[in-house]
């Protein structure tokens, strides 16, 4: 109603949600953009946008990570903002994903107990969908 699009900056979202500064050597190893709290916030934002026909773009490091694309697409993200050098790779990956499989996997990820489980789910679907990018 008030906006025409949402953009989720995943790096800042992660940093502020789980209170971990990725450049602080003492805590940088705890920086996890797939932390269940981060994924749930992303889902709530995207779902709110969908209810009002507001598209949600993803920017930040997650958008260019081919292992996490199935998760982002499954959550309902409508576009990825990546560096120009990644555009062909991300486009290829997205074209090879099955939306239904991504949605099913994302629903499992939303119930996940930890970041590793979420990464494993998304990576498995990515490897199945575009194996050539992992060679």
Annotate each predicted stretch with a short phrase.
Residues 1-135:
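Non-catalytic helical/linker scaffolds that mediate oligomerization, partner binding
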